[in-house]
Regions:
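Short beta-strand His + acidic residue motifs that chelate non-heme Fe in jelly-roll/DSBH
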Residues: 52, 70-71, 87, 93-100, ...
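A short, N-terminal "cap"/entry segment at the start of jelly-roll beta-barrel domains
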Residues: 1-36, 46, 120-130
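Structural motif
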Residues: 18, 72-74
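Short acidic-glycine-tyrosine-enriched beta hairpin
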Residues: 74-90
């Protein structure tokens, strides 16, 4: 019988808001008991986007539960519902919801589980060229 196993329903984990943008997220790392990765969800309302960022040492997988758009090094990609994207550490990424009236949720997994920035791992935000 498997003992190193966990199951979490998204609706059972409290949803919080990012202080900067107000996007909603759920931290799943602790409820799942993950030790080798971080797991979060981000839910975007129409017109919302995450802050463009990169990770110094963390590879990520993004799973688009409802589809959406992903900017990778300033190039926009349409990701279908259920699409899975791998992002290397140095790639600048941002997810966005371009729909008019639908929410979009992404599951985001990062490994290794480095850093302590509000439990989201080490990340860098590109400098504004303005």
């Amino acid at each position: 019988m498997a003992t190193d196993f966990s199951l979490v329903r998204l609706e059972d984990v409290e949803q919080e808001r990012f202080p900067e943008l107000g996007n909603r997220h759920r931290k799943l790392t602790e409820p799942l008991g993950c030790t080798e990765m971080r797991v979060n969800t981000v839910t975007l309302g129409p017109g919302e986007a995450t802050t463009p960022h990169a990770h110094e040492r963390q590879e990520e997988l993004y799973i688009a539960l409802d589809g959406g758009h992903l900017d990778v090094d300033e190039i926009r990609h349409e990701v279908p519902e259920g699409g899975v994207v791998r992002l290397g550490p140095d790639v600048v990424r941002s997810v966005r919801n371009e729909s008019q009236n639908e929410e979009q949720t992404w599951i985001m997994c990062g490994a290794p589980p480095v850093g302590t920035i509000d439990d989201f791992g080490e990340y860098t935000v590109p400098a504004d060229d303005d």
